[in-house]
UniProtKB/Swiss-Prot annotation:
The keyword Mitochondrion applies. This is Required for respiratory growth protein 1, mitochondrial. Belongs to the RRG1 family. Essential for respiratory growth and required for mitochondrial protein synthesis. Required for vacuolar acidification. Keywords: Mitochondrion. The keyword Nucleotide-binding does not apply. It comes from Candida glabrata (strain ATCC 2001 / BCRC 20586 / JCM 3761 / NBRC 0622 / NRRL Y-65 / CBS 138) (Yeast). It is found in: Mitochondrion.
Length: 377
């Protein structure tokens, strides 16, 4: 009797592999809403047709799932999202104009057609997480009309986010004022010193400093390439010297290159070429003749790295001088902290008592933005 396809191990392995591969591709999507929607649809359809005995139906489902997975793998999120309609048995159409508008915004952002609506998508993702959390705690019903989501729950979600932002600001003020600190980054073994403060962090960092750090790291990479080349040349030079010594007097050094020459390496900010204390090697003019140019190059590299290190050591001393760069940023940071503290106290006294999440100009987000506080929604 012919075995049904659902009992074949090859079929089960293929379906399971395709299912897992599709979920991995879904995880690459940036939008939280689209990612959740696709995972939900794929999982529900897989469970629904788990016991389906119709070969034609299963073939059609697997073919559609394979196409959906290929679209996601090629970063064609918009096409993959449109395939969900054909993948589902029953397509739920937008109940009103509002839902259709929200879906249009999400699709445009996924295809990079309208980047200005990124804030809108951020709010929708925030609303989605808010509703999911409340439903998990059984504080909201499973089915909520779209009008309630937009007009009632979205302001509450933004209000909750604003409260968390206020708490973070309050905790920051409790820790004390802003402080400048001396920091460094490594370019090999060289420390590049600079000042960190809230005045020059992230995008406010000096373009000159960024270029300086980048150029120093590139220089160090060039030194590493030169050292690698010297290491290779030293190995060849040693073998050439041994061969010429053999041609001169018939004496053959019965050793490998590592016996006479350690690898060229960067250690404690210095490049070293060390010969083994072997009298036969030291007295051999051929070896000295071949290895001396390499040793000269290594000494030049060592001097170069020492000069870079001394340069930034002097820079550190200059930064820490009285009335120098460090003192300037320290005073500036204290002044900015005092101004922020005054603004915060004025905001708490005059504006926060009248917060209303359902009125845009009285919401916490609007109040924070009016007072110059960054809000990412």
């Amino acid at each position: 009797m012919i075995t049904h396809f659902c009992e074949l191990a090859a079929h089960r392995n293929y379906v399971l592999a395709l299912y897992r591969h599709s979920l991995r591709n879904v995880s690459r999507i940036n939008s939280g809403f689209v990612k959740h929607k696709m995972k939900k649809v794929i999982t529900n359809e897989a469970r629904k047709h788990k016991n389906d005995k119709s070969s034609w139906s299963i073939y059609r489902r697997l073919k559609e799932l394979k196409l959906l997975s290929d679209k996601l793998e090629d970063d064609q999120v918009n096409d993959a999202y449109n395939l969900l309609d054909s993948f589902m048995k029953s397509v739920k159409k937008p109940k009103n104009e509002l839902k259709g508008h929200l879906m249009k915004i999400r699709t445009e952002i996924e295809t990079n057609k309208n980047i200005q609506d990124k804030t809108r998508l951020t709010r929708l993702n925030l609303l989605h997480r808010y509703i999911a959390k409340k439903q998990q705690n059984q504080l909201l019903t499973k089915h909520i009309p779209d009008e309630y989501k937009e007009k009632l729950l979205l302001p509450l979600a933004l209000h909750e986010k604003g409260i968390l932002r206020l708490a973070a600001i309050r905790n920051q003020f409790k820790k004390g004022g802003y402080h400048a600190k001396l920091s460094f980054t490594m370019a090999g073994k060289t420390r590049i010193w600079f000042i960190r403060s809230m005045l020059n962090k992230r995008k406010k960092q000096s373009l000159r400093l960024r270029n300086l750090i980048t150029s120093e790291k590139r220089r160090y990479l060039e030194v590493c390439k030169i050292v690698e080349s010297l290491n290779e040349n030293a190995n060849w030079a040693l073998h050439e010297a041994i061969w010429e010594r053999y041609l001169d007097d018939g004496y053959l050094h019965a050793t490998s290159s590592k016996g006479y020459l350690k690898m060229v390496e960067i250690e404690d900010n210095s490049v070293k070429l060390q010969n083994q204390n072997d009298s036969k090697v030291v007295k051999c003019q051929r070896l000295q003749q071949w290895l001396s140019p390499i040793q000269s190059s290594i000494l030049s590299l060592e001097n170069y790295l020492n000069q870079r290190q001394m340069k930034y050591a002097k820079l550190k001393t200059k930064i820490l001088e009285p009335k120098g760069v460090y003192d300037y940023y320290q005073k500036k940071s204290k002044r900015v902290f005092q101004n922020h503290m005054k603004t915060y106290k004025r905001m708490v006294k005059n504006e926060l008592p009248f917060v209303n999440p359902f009125i845009e100009r009285l919401s916490i987000g609007s109040i924070l933005k009016r007072n110059g506080i960054n809000v990412k929604y």
